[in-house]
Amino acid sequence: MAITFNTDRLQGLEGTTITGVYGRIQSVTVKKYDAETNPSVAVRWRCLYDVVLHASAVKRNASGEYPAWGNRLNSREIDHFTCTYDPTSDSNPYAQAYADLKTKLAAGGSPIASSIADA
């Protein structure tokens, strides 16, 4: 799974719109937060995920199985997110993370990205 999008929020390229950025979720961690310290608060599940960015799918694939850090694009606004995780859902953590990523990239009055699509 991966997505493509356009953005002007890359480090070192601020204000320059880069089209066809290829984003892939590299890792997902699901955490359960117990209500031990405060019994009135229910148990919470959170999903933490890291996003790796490349200039395009072609450039990502050309760099091999494990691309070097030098081949990646950087953006503090796009590289790490958290979301609520639903353990009762039929979808896996990666699917939930991708759905959340698409929503967060397009959200707000000044969205981080545009033309978001599955790759």
Over which residues does each language-model region extend?
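Viral virion structural and adsorption modules
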Residues: 1-46, 52, 56-119
